Amino acid sequence: MDLEKKAAPRGRPRLITQERIADAGIEIGLPNITFVGVASALGVTHMALYKHVPSLAELKHMVAEEIFRRWEFSLPKVGVHEGLQDYLVRFSDSVREFAKTYPGVTPYVIRRLVATPAMLEKIDAHQQEVAQAYRIEKDQSRQLLATIAFHGLAAADSVYSAARQETVVQTSFEAETAEMEGDLAQGMHALIAGALLQLQLDPALKP
């Protein structure tokens, strides 16, 4: 869907564009998105928004896709002598932070079969860049990054969803997340070490 094609009237900026819809959705947060809420943020009626986006499901998918598009993947630091394992740990941390920053985004980005061509292209380019930087096979890079992203997103989503649940015990979001983040990091380190071992790759491999 191309919301930008129709020319806006002279002197008046368009109120409904894909970028503005995404900005409003990100501000509201995926779990709280409604047609009325996004329309209100854009300064239009919800019926006007319906003319551009036919369903709530498509509206949420549009916002999630834009969140993913804006995500700047952690890339190898050529010349810094960062080992492959250290890089993968840093990438894992960025995956966790992504899930924490954007509650509700995980179901839209973890399933390859519902990913858009643009999302798949971005993933492929990242895998290719890591393969070239560390001089490993593209399929090895794909297995490493896909494994870390999948399990990192799934686990982080569970951690932060659990921390946001009401409990009968007095606690704080910060205290709960700090404890669970430590366990998550430990588990991801073990996953990374195991993935490198399975692929017979040197953890200290430098770019």
Regions found by a protein language model. Name each.
Residues 90, 110-146, 182:
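Amphipathic alpha-helical packing segments from all-alpha helical-bundle domains
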Residues 5, 12-37:
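Short, amphipathic alpha-helix enriched in basic
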Residues 1-4, 161-207:
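C-terminal peripheral helix-coil segments that are non-catalytic and often amphipathic
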Residues 65-72:
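Short, basic, alpha-helical segments at the C-terminal edge of helix-turn-helix-like DNA-binding modules
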Residues 73-105, 110-112, 148:
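Hydrophobic alpha-helical connector segments
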Residues 96-124, 157-167:
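Amphipathic alpha-helical segments used for helix-helix packing
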Residues 36, 45-48:
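Key DNA-contact positions within bacterial/archaeal DNA-binding proteins
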Residues 29-30, 43, 50-61:
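HTH DNA-binding helix-turn interface
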